[in-house]
Amino acid sequence: MLHSAPAIQELEEWREEFAKTRTEPVPHFDPADAGSAARVLFLLDSPGAETVSAEGPGFVSVDNPDQAAERCWTERNDAELHDGILLWNTVPFFLDGAEPTPVQTIAGVKALKSVLGLLPRLEVVVLCGTFTKNQWAKHMGAFSRPTVIKAPSPGSRGMISKKNQEDFRQAVRRAKRLVG
């Protein structure tokens, strides 16, 4: 499926080159997502262990077997936000449960800037989680093109409170309203 999804090809070519510069695993873009035709980017912190494990899917996807993916899928579905979506990470490589070092963070931010350059139709970025929001504010301020929506992390720690659950739901619904 990966090689038959034209919208994902340019991103996959970028990912392949980027992965050559990393010792950590770099998951693939989801071929079911919009790829370079994305209008909404859901930006999370970093890929989870399930994504890059030998048994895992190898994709950053709402279909992955983890709570963040499930929450993203559920809220997008409830908001009827089905098309023009891409899911990716601020630090696009697996960190083995550790917090990213400053060097890893900078590498992730540089990679993100490259990915944003491959998304000419991007209208909305949903920043999911404190780390992602902080890195965007610190490093991406010059990007005025997409509308930025701040949201809690859809992962288990981020969704502990009912308020965070509702805030995430409202962020997804706002993204839907903005892109129609």
Where are these regions (language model features)?
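Short, flexible loop segments at boundaries between secondary-structure elements
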Residues: 77, 81, 144-179
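A polyanion-binding, active-site-adjacent surface
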Residues: 1-154
